[in-house]
Amino acid sequence: MMPAKLQLDVLRTLQSSARHGTQTLKNSTFLERFHNNRIVFCLPFFLALFFVPVQKVLQHLCLRFTQVAPYFKIQLFDLPSRHAENLAPLLASCRIQYTNCFSSSSNGQVPSIISLYLRVDLSPFYAKIFQISYRVPMIWLDVFQVFFVFLVISQHSLHS
């Protein structure tokens, strides 16, 4: 499991980028769907991440790749726009997968996945989406939410 210190360090990095950023990331829609007794749960990565500058996030992730490599799989790829004549191409997307966060289910070894998706659409509207999605056994859903809220509260208490 990822050390708590590294989790806090990654969150502090994103929060620091948010405080010094000029570009904003708009809120994404709430999505939820079930699949084979697992849940794919997408929601905005709230708090500071609503105002994270896109380039700084990518830069920090690249700089910290060697540190988080044992815990994250980082993949950068391009997604061209379907309507290039109307919208600027979708230049970059960043996907971070954090595996083996939770214990395996009773059915056997089922690797859990936590992914951060960063999609930057350089259209006139600058639609930027930053969302966290995770697929875990159903019993871990509330555990993860409680842990995430506790992590956020801890961050606020450290800064105050």
Curated annotation (Swiss-Prot):
Q: Can you tell me where the transmembrane regions are?
A: 39-59, 136-156
Query: Does Membrane count among this protein's keywords?
Result: yes
Compartments reported by the entry: Membrane
Provide the primary localization: membrane
For membrane topology, the record states: Multi-pass membrane protein
Acetylation among keywords: no
Q: Which domain of life is it from?
A: Eukaryota
> What are the GO cellular component annotations?
membrane
Keywords of the record, alphabetical order, are:
Membrane, Transmembrane, Transmembrane helix
Other remarks on this protein: Completely overlaps YIL177C.
State the family it belongs to. Belongs to the UPF0479 family.
Name of this chain's protein: Putative UPF0479 protein YIL177W-A
